[in-house]
């Protein structure tokens, strides 16, 4: 098996040690199987210290939401997981982001292979300037050699998982630009999962969508966690409460509190968290 295939047919990996995880400032959590472990993470835009000593465990097979005011660092943290910052020499990360025993910040793995394991969907729908079919097939072709029949099956599978197949199955050769905003975002999600990643990152995936499209995306997120570890950044606290199993509240580049979503929203430990959730922030 070559490196490009390894993420598609993963062997059993060593699970993170079981034990009690602690949220910011010592809040106890139940034992978790962490998919991603963030240890002493600091991030800089030139000299600006954007993330400050972040320690966090992302539970496997769950939806984790990052919330906080604009500029708090939640999107920056999300983008460190698949090294989006590597495109910009003035940006740097220090510390550890561990996944399956490997520090993603220092790995020698080809960055395209890393991003195949950790897919990402951005705030604004970004279909490629090609057909709906080719939008899905594009990434798959980078990592697998499939027959046309196999590719047809993969395209149908991904679009079905993204709850889009029934809406586009008769127009696969049409441009992705012809879809509505909500359909385009589901197309981007289908494109992200077509290469079968282990983790799916969603950066404000509903901010540009109408309420009906937002509802469909939220339903999709709930379904995806059965197959993927999902991390979502959102300004919408109600969305975080509806969609996530765990929530991290961030402020000024620091992780203030992390825990089970229900507890964070009903009985947070930190006053800063309570003030933000109840609208008394600032």
Curated annotation (Swiss-Prot):
**PROSITE patterns (UniProt xref):** ABC_TRANSPORTER_1, ABC_TRANSPORTER_2, PSTB
* Top-tier EC class: translocase
List the residue ranges of the region (Disordered). Answer: 1-24
Per UniProt, ATP binds at: 68-75
Record bears the keyword Cell membrane: yes
Main localisation: membrane
Single GO MF annotation: ATPase-coupled phosphate ion transmembrane transporter activity
Catalysed reaction equations from the record = phosphate(out) + ATP + H2O = ADP + 2 phosphate(in) + H(+)
Q: GO annotations under biological process?
A: phosphate ion transmembrane transport
Q: Where is this gene product found?
A: Cell inner membrane
Q: What is its EC number?
A: 7.3.2.1
Q: Where is the ABC transporter domain?
A: 36-277
Q: Keywords assigned by UniProt?
A: ATP-binding, Cell inner membrane, Cell membrane, Membrane, Nucleotide-binding, Phosphate transport, Translocase, Transport
Topology with respect to the bilayer? Peripheral membrane protein
Return the SUPFAM superfamilies for the record.
Answer: P-loop containing nucleoside triphosphate hydrolases
Of the GO CC terms on this record, one is: plasma membrane
- PANTHER family cross-referenced by the UniProt entry: ABC TRANSPORTER I FAMILY MEMBER 17, PHOSPHATE IMPORT ATP-BINDING PROTEIN PSTB
Record family assignment: Belongs to the ABC transporter superfamily. Phosphate importer (TC 3.A.1.7) family.
The subunit field of the Swiss-Prot or TrEMBL record says: The complex is composed of two ATP-binding proteins (PstB), two transmembrane proteins (PstC and PstA) and a solute-binding protein (PstS).
Question: What job does the chain carry out?
Answer: Part of the ABC transporter complex PstSACB involved in phosphate import. Responsible for energy coupling to the transport system.
This protein is called what? Phosphate import ATP-binding protein PstB
Organism taxonomic ancestry:
Bacteria, Pseudomonadati, Pseudomonadota, Betaproteobacteria, Burkholderiales
């Amino acid at each position: 098996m070559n490196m490009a295939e390894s993420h598609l047919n993963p062997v059993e990996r060593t699970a993170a040690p079981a034990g009690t995880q602690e949220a910011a400032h010592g809040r106890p959590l139940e034992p978790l199987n962490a998919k991603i472990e963030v240890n002493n993470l600091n991030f800089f835009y030139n000299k600006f210290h954007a993330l400050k000593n972040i320690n966090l465990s992302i539970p496997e097979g769950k939806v984790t939401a990052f919330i906080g005011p604009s500029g708090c660092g939640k999107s920056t943290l999300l983008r460190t997981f698949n090294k989006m910052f590597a495109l910009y020499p003035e940006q740097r990360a220090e510390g550890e982001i561990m996944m399956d025993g490997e520090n993603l910040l220092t790995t020698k793995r080809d960055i395209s292979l890393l991003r195949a394991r950790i897919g990402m969907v951005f705030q604004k729908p970004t279909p490629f300037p090609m057909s709906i079919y080719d939008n899905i097939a594009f990434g798959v072709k980078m990592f697998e050699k499939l027959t046309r029949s196999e590719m047809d099956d993969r395209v149908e599978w991904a679009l079905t998982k993204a709850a889009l197949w029934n809406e586009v199955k008769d127009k696969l050769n049409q441009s992705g630009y012809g879809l509505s905003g909500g359909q385009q975002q589901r197309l981007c999600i289908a494109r992200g999962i077509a290469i079968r990643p282990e983790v799916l990152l969603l950066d404000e995936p509903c901010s540009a969508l109408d309420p009906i499209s937002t509802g469909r995306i939220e339903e999709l997120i709930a379904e995806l966690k059965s197959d993927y570890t999902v991390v979502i950044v959102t300004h919408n606290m109600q969305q975080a409460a509806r969609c996530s199993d765990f929530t991290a509240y961030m402020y000024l580049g620091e992780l203030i509190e992390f825990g089970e979503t229900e507890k964070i929203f009903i009985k947070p430990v930190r006053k800063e968290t309570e003030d933000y959730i109840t609208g008394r922030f600032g």
